From Swiss-Prot:
Binding site for Zn(2+): 109, 114, 138, 141
NCBIfam families per UniProt: ATCase_reg (TIGR00240)
Cofactor: Zn(2+)
Database matches in Gene3D superfamilies: Aspartate carbamoyltransferase regulatory subunit, C-terminal domain, Aspartate carbamoyltransferase regulatory subunit, N-terminal domain
Designated name of the protein: Aspartate carbamoyltransferase regulatory chain
Family: Belongs to the PyrI family.
Membrane-traversing stretches: none
Co-factor binding details: Binds 1 zinc ion per subunit.
Organism: Shigella flexneri
Known role: Involved in allosteric regulation of aspartate carbamoyltransferase.
A GO cellular component entry from the record: aspartate carbamoyltransferase complex
Amino acid sequence: MTHDNKLQVEAIKRGTVIDHIPAQIGFKLLSLFKLTETDQRITIGLNLPSGEMGRKDLIKIENTFLSEEQVDQLALYAPQATVNRIDNYEVVGKSRPSLPERIDNVLVCPNSNCISHAEPVSSSFAVRKRANDIALKCKYCEKEFSHNVVLAN
């Protein structure tokens, strides 16, 4: 194996690989989706070279598989991501996120007057695709925000 073909992040026997994450987004995904709340080994590659993207992030989680809902929620942050299911070091399934109708329990409403900040309720946003943007509407205050505003919160 030549130096150019060497794996930059160790292979896993069984679990999930989230590939083609835009550079600088990997840590945000780990935090928002609470992917670190496990006792399983997690391998993170940051700013890895990518032919398509220039640079990319990569997350590997052993013995853990994402639900279809979790995969789709990645669409806001990494619409071009590929989620691979690994078994016995082989890719046994591949999926790409598609924009869900709702995103629950992940984001925080940017409206400081929203009841979701004062009450013990789970966040919930309706997702709408616009011409050049994605709009998120809070279930509680019913205010609509550009997804960039909510993601920066």
